[in-house]
Amino acid sequence: MLKFMAKYVVLALLLMGCAGLDMGKENLEKFEDTSEAYLMALRWGEYETAYGFKRRPNSYDEIPDFHDLRDVRVTSHRIKQTIISEDEMTVMQIVDFQYYRMRNVTVKTITDRQKWEYDQEKKRWYLMSDLPNFE
């Protein structure tokens, strides 16, 4: 009888582990979608939209003035590295952006180090780092 119970306990633990893997996979798929939407917002100059991916402790915090970014044109981006934490709740992503400013058409490259965290309660990813500093 003890062996019989032990088999069911092991089976239940395996099933719970598999369910956890599915949850992790689902969260990482959400991250890919979120990251791509964020990168596309930057690519098309939608800086207010990109800022909406940031976690703000207080929704009444002052939103930055994006006026200085209106002449920035991102020509391309390339994800260089993605580092996923062991618990799959934090992702560090390193992205190269090529861009220029309308007043000076010299193409520049900036490396952006992004930190993302998953909010289990809201079931979404938040950008914890700042937007790229396009000089």
Identify the meaning behind each predicted range.
Residues E86-E135:
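Exposed beta-sheet edge and beta->alpha loop/turn motif
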Residues M1, R43-E46, R101:
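Secondary-structure transition/hinge residues
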Residues E32-D33, Y47-M92:
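Short solvent-exposed beta->alpha transition segments
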Residues M16, E48, K123:
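Glycine-centered loop/turn positions within well-structured domains
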Residues M1-G20:
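Sec-dependent bacterial lipoprotein signal peptides
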Residues G17-W44:
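Short, low-complexity N-terminal intrinsically disordered segments enriched in polar/charged residues
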Residues A37-G45, F53-P57, D119:
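Structured segments of extracytoplasmic/periplasmic soluble domains
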